[in-house]
Structures are given as C-alpha cells and as structure tokens.
C-alpha cells in the first residue's frame, strides 16, 4: 500500500502527513465498511475549527483515492425534497481491482508492438 500512496501523493516530505491520513482512511474504511463525512474527517484528525482549510485538506486526501476507485462515496438524502444529504464513504477493493486491471491492460496494449 505504501508504494501506491507514493504514486498518488508523491514523495515530498510536505505530503507525508497527507499520505499518513490516506493510509489511515483506507484502514478505517476497511475495518468499518462505511463512514459518514464528518465521522471520517474527525477520525483523520481534521478539526474544522483548527485547520485553516479543513475541507481542502479532507478532499486532498480523499480525491486521489476516489479517482482510482479504492473508495467511493454515496449521497444519502435526509429529507424528501432532496436538498439535504449526508455523504457516506465506503471501501471498494473490487472496483479498485477492476480499475487497475483496465489501466494496465490499456497500457500494455499501447506499448505492445
């Protein structure tokens, strides 16, 4: 997992805490199955009153993991007018496997002579 996180977030020492949060995200979602946005942010140690830009930090951790489909999100609407909702994140290793297989197959077919 460490090498995958290095590919996603880079080797910079400035991103070390982001890589740690990403690893913790994967472990938490693997153990619990799914977590709501606020619950996950709190578990990662992102305090909304302490960080200068907490949402930016949260999505900087989450978006690369969503891009490779290792985690996915789902909106659960809390009212009938569908204006209020909760975002729930969950771990999906099967989607990740499919995504990586497709990427590697495309790469292999392009470099194959």
Model-identified regions with their sequence ranges:
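Short acidic/glycine-enriched loop/turn segments that link adjacent beta-strands
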Residues: 80-85
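A short, conserved structural fragment
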Residues: 66-78
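Short, locally clustered residues in the helix-turn-helix/winged-helix DNA-binding domain
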Residues: 27-31, 45, 70
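Short, amphipathic alpha-helical interaction segments positioned at domain boundaries
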Residues: 87-113
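Short amphipathic alpha-helical interaction segments
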Residues: 50-68
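Short alpha-helical segments that sit at the start of domains
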Residues: 1-31
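Alpha-helix N-cap/helix-initiation sites
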Residues: 14-19, 33-37, 51-55
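Short acidic, hydrophobic short linear motifs in intrinsically disordered regions
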Residues: 34-46
């Amino acid at each position: 997992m460490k090498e995958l996180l290095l590919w996603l977030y880079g080797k910079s020492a400035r991103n070390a805490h982001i890589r740690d949060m990403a690893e913790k995200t994967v472990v938490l979602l693997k153990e619990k199955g799914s977590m709501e946005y606020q619950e996950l942010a709190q578990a990662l140690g992102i305090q909304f009153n302490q960080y200068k830009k907490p949402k930016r930090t949260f999505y900087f951790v989450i978006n690369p993991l969503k891009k490779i489909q290792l985690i996915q999100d789902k909106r659960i609407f809390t009212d009938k007018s569908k204006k209020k909702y909760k975002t729930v994140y969950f771990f999906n290793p099967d989607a990740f496997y499919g995504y990586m297989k497709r990427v590697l197959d495309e790469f292999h077919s392009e470099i194959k002579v």
